[in-house]
């Protein structure tokens, strides 16, 4: 399949960093912001397929690339993580003047961002945000981290760790005094990586603290816009705690779909 044609725009952040956002723009006053998963980008097949579908149906699209995910190292020590909603907020503010309706769609880590952003009192939500969809989301990061340690997920974890480790070597060259790269030798799981690197460079105490504060599950009761979460029952990345049934039953705005099949982000065809 031919790749979707995006027009790239660079947004400068308040902390002197940048975000590369890939747009498909048409005359529509409706835009969908797409948020990718761990170690993904606007090149990810599920982002490409979704962008293509939305564009064919008359929506403009803004596909985020988180810090250090657009093929270029970011300027600051901080990178992206499951709770980094301030960068999503920056993208929303960037598109706000040009559109009447904004929709947020997030996959996996990106879905956690979308849910957390909508339920976090840190942000006053624009009335232009109309609805949200989150797909294959580890709403309980600790539970998901335990699921990822299961033997059937070894290959997935290894693939993530391989690219994350490469990034840390580059970060070490950029900030030699801020990163103890020797800790990489101790990293055997994603939890280890979050303990030694993700948490430390992003202002958390350790993986436990990061998972506690960044998990979106605690923010779901505060969601005020129509929001759909689709988590497949056969998703190997999700623990039982990643299916917020009670929260959905008690909310007027949050809806949960739990199809039997779909795996992890397996609903999206290749387009």
Short names for language-model regions:
Residues 1-25, 268-270:
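N-terminal cap/lid segment of alpha/beta-hydrolase-fold proteins
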Residues 103-202:
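Alpha/beta-hydrolase-fold enzymes
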Residues 249-266:
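Catalytic histidine neighborhood in serine/cysteine hydrolases
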């Amino acid at each position: 399949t031919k790749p979707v044609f995006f027009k790239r725009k660079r947004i400068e952040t308040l902390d002197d960093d940048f975000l590369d956002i890939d747009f498909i723009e048409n005359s529509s006053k409706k835009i969908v912001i797409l948020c990718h998963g761990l170690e993904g980008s606007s090149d990810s097949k599920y982002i490409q397929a979704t962008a293509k579908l939305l564009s064919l149906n008359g929506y403009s699209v803004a596909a985020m690339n988180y810090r250090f995910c657009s093929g270029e190292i970011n300027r600051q020590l901080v990178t992206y993580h499951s709770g980094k909603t301030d960068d999503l907020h920056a993208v929303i503010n960037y598109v706000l003047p040009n559109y009447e309706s904004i929709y947020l769609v997030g996959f996996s880590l990106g879905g956690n961002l979308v849910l957390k952003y909508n339920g976090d009192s840190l942000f006053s939500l624009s009335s232009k945000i109309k609805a949200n969809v989150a797909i294959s989301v580890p709403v309980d990061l600790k539970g998901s981290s335990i699921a990822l340690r299961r033997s059937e997920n070894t290959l997935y974890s290894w693939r993530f760790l391989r690219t994350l480790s490469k990034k840390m070597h580059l970060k070490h060259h950029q900030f030699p005094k801020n990163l103890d790269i020797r800790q990489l030798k101790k990293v055997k799981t994603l939890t280890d990586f979050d303990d030694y690197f993700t948490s430390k460079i992003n202002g958390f105490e350790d993986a436990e603290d990061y998972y506690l504060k960044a998990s979106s599950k605690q923010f779901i009761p505060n969601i005020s816009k129509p929001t759909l979460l689709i988590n497949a029952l056969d998703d190997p990345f999700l623990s039982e705690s990643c299916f917020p049934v009670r929260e959905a039953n008690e909310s007027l705005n949050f809806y949960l779909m739990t199809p039997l099949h779909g795996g992890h982000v397996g609903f999206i065809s290749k387009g």
